[in-house]
UniProtKB/Swiss-Prot annotation:
UniProt GO BP: diaminopimelate biosynthetic process; lysine biosynthetic process via diaminopimelate
GO molecular-function terms, A-Z: 4-hydroxy-tetrahydrodipicolinate reductase; NAD binding; NADP binding; oxidoreductase activity, acting on CH or CH2 groups, NAD or NADP as acceptor
Chain's role: Catalyzes the conversion of 4-hydroxy-tetrahydrodipicolinate (HTPA) to tetrahydrodipicolinate.
Catalytic activity: (S)-2,3,4,5-tetrahydrodipicolinate + NAD(+) + H2O = (2S,4S)-4-hydroxy-2,3,4,5-tetrahydrodipicolinate + NADH + H(+); (S)-2,3,4,5-tetrahydrodipicolinate + NADP(+) + H2O = (2S,4S)-4-hydroxy-2,3,4,5-tetrahydrodipicolinate + NADPH + H(+)
A cellular component term, taken from the record's GO annotations: cytosol
Protein known as: 4-hydroxy-tetrahydrodipicolinate reductase
Stored Pfam families: DapB_C (PF05173), DapB_N (PF01113)
Positions contributing to NAD(+) binding: G9, A10, K11, G12, R13, V14, G77, T78, T79, A104, P105, N106, F107
Organism expressing this protein natively: Corynebacterium efficiens (strain DSM 44549 / YS-314 / AJ 12310 / JCM 11189 / NBRC 100395)
Catalytic residues (UniProt): H134 (proton donor/acceptor), K138 (proton donor)
Pathway membership, UniProt: Amino-acid biosynthesis; L-lysine biosynthesis via DAP pathway; (S)-tetrahydrodipicolinate from L-aspartate: step 4/4
Record: residues binding (S)-2,3,4,5-tetrahydrodipicolinate: H135, G144, T145
Protein backbone atom coordinates (compact mmCIF):
# COMPACT_ATOMS: atom_id res chain seq x y z
CA UNK A 1 0.00 0.00 0.00
CA UNK A 2 1.30 3.43 -0.93
CA UNK A 3 1.78 5.94 1.88
CA UNK A 4 -0.69 8.80 1.49
CA UNK A 5 1.14 12.14 1.60
CA UNK A 6 0.01 15.74 1.97
CA UNK A 7 2.25 18.74 1.35
CA UNK A 8 1.85 21.99 3.27
CA UNK A 9 3.34 24.96 1.47
CA UNK A 10 2.78 23.12 -1.79
CA UNK A 11 3.04 26.24 -3.96
CA UNK A 12 6.34 27.40 -2.46
CA UNK A 13 9.67 26.69 -4.11
CA UNK A 14 10.58 23.78 -1.86
CA UNK A 15 6.97 22.63 -1.71
CA UNK A 16 6.79 22.32 -5.49
CA UNK A 17 10.00 20.29 -5.44
CA UNK A 18 8.55 17.90 -2.85
CA UNK A 19 5.28 17.55 -4.78
CA UNK A 20 7.25 16.55 -7.88
CA UNK A 21 9.44 14.15 -5.91
CA UNK A 22 6.46 12.38 -4.31
CA UNK A 23 4.71 12.10 -7.68
CA UNK A 24 7.84 10.51 -9.11
CA UNK A 25 7.72 7.53 -6.71
CA UNK A 26 5.84 4.25 -6.84
CA UNK A 27 5.38 3.77 -3.09
CA UNK A 28 3.99 7.21 -2.18
CA UNK A 29 0.66 8.78 -3.17
CA UNK A 30 0.17 12.55 -3.15
CA UNK A 31 -3.36 13.11 -1.83
CA UNK A 32 -3.32 16.78 -0.78
CA UNK A 33 -1.54 19.96 -1.87
CA UNK A 34 -2.27 22.63 0.73
CA UNK A 35 -1.14 26.25 0.67
CA UNK A 36 -1.76 29.23 2.95
CA UNK A 37 -5.24 29.96 1.56
CA UNK A 38 -6.46 26.37 1.97
CA UNK A 39 -8.19 24.72 4.91
CA UNK A 40 -6.18 22.14 6.86
CA UNK A 41 -9.26 19.90 6.88
CA UNK A 42 -8.21 18.92 3.34
CA UNK A 43 -5.56 16.74 4.97
CA UNK A 44 -8.14 14.78 6.95
CA UNK A 45 -10.62 14.58 4.08
CA UNK A 46 -7.92 13.21 1.75
CA UNK A 47 -6.81 10.55 4.21
CA UNK A 48 -3.23 11.83 4.44
CA UNK A 49 -1.06 9.65 6.67
CA UNK A 50 2.07 11.82 6.52
CA UNK A 51 2.32 15.56 5.94
CA UNK A 52 5.40 17.40 4.73
CA UNK A 53 5.59 20.96 6.07
CA UNK A 54 7.66 23.62 4.32
CA UNK A 55 5.68 26.69 5.36
CA UNK A 56 6.69 29.55 7.69
CA UNK A 57 7.69 29.84 11.36
CA UNK A 58 4.42 31.66 12.03
CA UNK A 59 2.29 28.88 10.56
CA UNK A 60 4.11 25.69 11.47
CA UNK A 61 2.98 25.32 15.10
CA UNK A 62 -0.70 25.58 14.20
CA UNK A 63 -0.13 23.11 11.39
CA UNK A 64 1.56 20.64 13.73
CA UNK A 65 -1.10 20.92 16.41
CA UNK A 66 -3.78 20.16 13.83
CA UNK A 67 -1.89 17.24 12.27
CA UNK A 68 -0.87 15.59 15.54
CA UNK A 69 -4.35 15.90 17.04
CA UNK A 70 -5.77 14.29 13.89
CA UNK A 71 -3.33 11.37 13.94
CA UNK A 72 -1.25 12.58 10.99
CA UNK A 73 2.53 12.27 11.20
CA UNK A 74 4.65 15.19 10.00
CA UNK A 75 8.00 15.66 8.27
CA UNK A 76 9.00 19.27 8.93
CA UNK A 77 11.58 21.38 7.14
CA UNK A 78 10.21 24.71 8.34
CA UNK A 79 12.58 26.72 10.54
CA UNK A 80 12.03 28.67 13.75
CA UNK A 81 12.06 25.94 16.41
CA UNK A 82 13.44 26.78 19.85
CA UNK A 83 13.35 24.64 22.99
CA UNK A 84 9.92 25.96 24.01
CA UNK A 85 8.43 25.02 20.66
CA UNK A 86 10.05 21.58 20.72
CA UNK A 87 8.68 21.00 24.22
CA UNK A 88 5.19 21.89 23.00
CA UNK A 89 5.47 19.44 20.09
CA UNK A 90 6.61 16.71 22.49
CA UNK A 91 3.57 17.42 24.65
CA UNK A 92 1.21 17.11 21.70
CA UNK A 93 2.88 13.85 20.65
CA UNK A 94 2.62 12.45 24.18
CA UNK A 95 -1.16 12.89 23.98
CA UNK A 96 -1.35 11.19 20.58
CA UNK A 97 0.62 7.95 20.73
CA UNK A 98 1.75 6.53 17.43
CA UNK A 99 2.09 9.89 15.70
CA UNK A 100 5.60 10.73 14.57
CA UNK A 101 7.12 14.16 13.98
CA UNK A 102 10.49 14.60 12.29
CA UNK A 103 11.91 18.12 12.49
CA UNK A 104 15.14 18.52 10.58
CA UNK A 105 17.21 21.68 10.18
CA UNK A 106 18.28 20.35 6.79
CA UNK A 107 17.15 17.48 4.58
CA UNK A 108 20.11 17.50 2.20
CA UNK A 109 22.07 14.30 2.88
CA UNK A 110 25.35 16.19 2.42
CA UNK A 111 24.32 18.68 5.11
CA UNK A 112 23.31 15.91 7.50
CA UNK A 113 26.65 14.18 7.01
CA UNK A 114 28.45 17.51 7.56
CA UNK A 115 26.78 17.79 10.96
CA UNK A 116 27.68 14.20 11.84
CA UNK A 117 31.30 14.52 10.68
CA UNK A 118 31.69 17.84 12.52
CA UNK A 119 30.60 16.26 15.77
CA UNK A 120 33.06 13.41 15.25
CA UNK A 121 35.94 15.80 14.55
CA UNK A 122 35.22 18.26 17.37
CA UNK A 123 37.20 16.58 20.15
CA UNK A 124 40.42 16.55 18.12
CA UNK A 125 40.72 20.33 17.60
CA UNK A 126 41.16 23.31 19.92
CA UNK A 127 39.05 25.66 17.83
CA UNK A 128 35.91 25.39 15.72
CA UNK A 129 33.80 27.95 13.86
CA UNK A 130 30.81 27.60 11.53
CA UNK A 131 30.10 29.68 8.43
CA UNK A 132 26.74 29.39 6.68
CA UNK A 133 25.87 31.04 3.37
CA UNK A 134 22.35 31.40 1.95
CA UNK A 135 20.26 33.33 -0.55
CA UNK A 136 19.20 36.83 0.61
CA UNK A 137 15.51 35.87 0.94
CA UNK A 138 16.14 33.55 3.90
CA UNK A 139 14.24 34.85 6.93
CA UNK A 140 16.37 33.53 9.80
CA UNK A 141 20.04 33.93 10.69
CA UNK A 142 22.00 31.96 11.53
CA UNK A 143 20.36 29.01 9.84
CA UNK A 144 18.89 26.12 11.79
CA UNK A 145 21.50 23.88 10.19
CA UNK A 146 24.36 26.05 11.46
CA UNK A 147 22.86 26.21 14.95
CA UNK A 148 22.38 22.43 15.02
CA UNK A 149 25.95 21.94 13.79
CA UNK A 150 27.38 24.24 16.45
CA UNK A 151 25.33 22.61 19.20
CA UNK A 152 26.64 19.19 18.16
CA UNK A 153 30.23 20.43 18.20
CA UNK A 154 29.75 22.02 21.62
CA UNK A 155 28.20 18.87 23.05
CA UNK A 156 31.06 16.73 21.72
CA UNK A 157 33.58 19.12 23.27
CA UNK A 158 31.80 18.95 26.64
CA UNK A 159 31.71 15.17 26.54
CA UNK A 160 35.47 15.18 25.87
CA UNK A 161 36.07 17.53 28.82
CA UNK A 162 37.57 20.24 26.63
CA UNK A 163 38.16 23.80 27.82
CA UNK A 164 36.74 26.91 26.18
CA UNK A 165 38.17 27.81 22.80
CA UNK A 166 41.19 30.15 22.77
CA UNK A 167 40.26 33.68 21.67
CA UNK A 168 42.17 36.76 22.85
CA UNK A 169 39.87 39.28 21.14
CA UNK A 170 39.42 42.37 23.33
CA UNK A 171 38.07 44.89 20.80
CA UNK A 172 35.55 44.03 18.09
CA UNK A 173 32.78 45.64 16.11
CA UNK A 174 29.34 44.30 17.00
CA UNK A 175 28.81 40.96 15.30
CA UNK A 176 32.33 40.67 13.93
CA UNK A 177 32.96 37.42 15.81
CA UNK A 178 29.60 35.99 14.81
CA UNK A 179 26.80 34.63 16.95
CA UNK A 180 27.79 32.61 20.00
CA UNK A 181 26.06 29.21 19.96
CA UNK A 182 27.12 27.29 23.07
CA UNK A 183 30.59 28.80 22.77
CA UNK A 184 30.96 28.11 19.04
CA UNK A 185 31.12 31.20 16.76
CA UNK A 186 28.62 31.02 13.90
CA UNK A 187 28.80 33.43 10.96
CA UNK A 188 25.91 34.04 8.53
CA UNK A 189 26.32 35.28 4.94
CA UNK A 190 23.35 36.37 2.81
CA UNK A 191 24.22 36.75 -0.86
CA UNK A 192 22.59 36.65 -4.29
CA UNK A 193 23.58 33.56 -6.23
CA UNK A 194 23.71 31.35 -3.15
CA UNK A 195 21.23 28.60 -2.25
CA UNK A 196 22.41 26.81 0.92
CA UNK A 197 26.02 26.24 1.92
CA UNK A 198 27.97 25.51 5.10
CA UNK A 199 31.62 25.29 6.10
CA UNK A 200 32.91 24.07 9.45
CA UNK A 201 36.50 25.06 10.16
CA UNK A 202 38.54 23.29 12.84
CA UNK A 203 42.02 24.23 14.01
CA UNK A 204 44.71 23.00 16.36
CA UNK A 205 48.50 23.10 16.56
CA UNK A 206 49.91 23.34 13.02
CA UNK A 207 46.82 22.11 11.17
CA UNK A 208 43.25 22.88 10.17
CA UNK A 209 40.33 20.86 8.82
CA UNK A 210 37.47 22.25 6.74
CA UNK A 211 34.25 20.29 6.20
CA UNK A 212 32.19 21.96 3.47
CA UNK A 213 28.76 21.28 2.02
CA UNK A 214 26.92 22.88 -0.92
CA UNK A 215 23.30 22.62 -2.04
CA UNK A 216 23.05 24.11 -5.52
CA UNK A 217 19.28 23.77 -5.89
CA UNK A 218 16.28 22.72 -3.87
CA UNK A 219 16.21 19.26 -5.42
CA UNK A 220 18.95 18.42 -2.91
CA UNK A 221 16.33 18.32 -0.14
CA UNK A 222 14.03 15.77 -1.82
CA UNK A 223 15.90 12.49 -1.12
CA UNK A 224 16.07 13.27 2.60
CA UNK A 225 12.39 14.21 2.76
CA UNK A 226 11.47 10.92 1.08
CA UNK A 227 13.55 9.05 3.68
CA UNK A 228 11.54 10.82 6.38
CA UNK A 229 8.18 10.00 4.82
CA UNK A 230 9.04 6.34 4.35
CA UNK A 231 10.44 5.78 7.85
CA UNK A 232 8.39 8.00 10.15
CA UNK A 233 5.98 5.20 11.07
CA UNK A 234 8.88 3.46 12.84
CA UNK A 235 9.69 6.61 14.86
CA UNK A 236 6.71 7.68 17.02
CA UNK A 237 7.06 10.89 18.99
CA UNK A 238 9.38 13.78 18.19
CA UNK A 239 12.70 13.26 16.42
CA UNK A 240 15.01 16.21 15.75
CA UNK A 241 17.50 15.63 12.94
CA UNK A 242 17.37 13.38 9.88
CA UNK A 243 20.56 11.63 11.02
CA UNK A 244 18.45 9.54 13.40
CA UNK A 245 16.66 8.00 10.40
CA UNK A 246 19.88 7.10 8.57
CA UNK A 247 22.02 3.99 9.07
CA UNK A 248 25.17 5.85 10.12
Amino acid sequence: MAIKVGVLGAKGRVGQTIVAAVNDTDDLELVAEVDHDDDLSLLVDSGAEVVVDFTTPNAVMGNLEFCINNGISAVVGTTGFDEDRLAQVRSWCASNEGVGVLIAPNFAISAVLTMVFARQAARFFESAEVIELHHPNKLDAPSGTAIHTAQGIAEARREAGMAAQPDATEQALDGSRGADVDGIPVHAVRMSGMVAHEAVIFGTQGQTLTIKQDSYDRNSFAPGVLVGIRNIAQHPGLTVGLEHYLDL
